[in-house]
């Protein structure tokens, strides 16, 4: 049985590689489409670092806290073009982003959200979700992102807000909404 399972894995990997040959698979010594060795998001996914939620298709993690509740949602596979995502992954990417926004909304009650989809900074498809509050100095404008090399005062969720958010994420994981 183990031999059959290994054969199936190798065959699927091989077929995948022929279809999307891009990244070297360390285990099978051929091109592999799943994770890019130079991508910081792929490294976090591989190491299970800072992940708040994951399913078969996406991962969710906190972003840089220059805006309170900044969340990043991304596919588990490394893809640089939204139009090339597999239909199931795209569906999860879009629908689960909305669910994460709802969970965050119950925790911190923002007035609105700004969503950013940028291809020019980190070449792994992802949404930046910025909860926005009328009290923000730049409310009504796109989020101001501090220079990567400059320090900023982190805007973190309170313990109570985190607890509410995590409870909502657990409900999401359990398929309760």
Residue ranges: model-predicted function:
Residues 1-177:
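HIT superfamily nucleotide-processing domains
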């Amino acid at each position: 049985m183990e031999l059959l399972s290994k054969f199936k894995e190798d065959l699927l990997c091989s077929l995948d590689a022929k279809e999307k040959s891009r990244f070297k698979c360390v285990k099978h010594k051929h091109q592999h489409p799943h994770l890019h060795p130079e991508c910081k998001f792929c490294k976090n996914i591989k190491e299970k670092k800072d992940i708040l939620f994951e399913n078969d298709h996406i991962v969710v993690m906190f972003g840089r806290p220059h805006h309170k509740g900044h969340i990043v949602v991304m596919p588990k596979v490394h893809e640089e073009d939204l139009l090339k995502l597999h239909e199931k992954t795209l569906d999860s990417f879009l629908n689960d982003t909305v669910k994460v926004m709802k969970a965050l909304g119950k925790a911190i009650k923002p007035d609105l959200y700004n969503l950013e989809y940028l291809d020019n900074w980190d070449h792994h498809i992802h949404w930046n979700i910025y909860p926005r509050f009328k009290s923000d100095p730049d409310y009504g404008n796109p989020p101001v992102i501090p220079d990567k090399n400059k320090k900023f005062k982190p805007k973190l969720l309170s313990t109570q807000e985190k607890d509410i958010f995590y409870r909502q994420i657990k409900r999401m994981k359990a398929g309760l909404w």
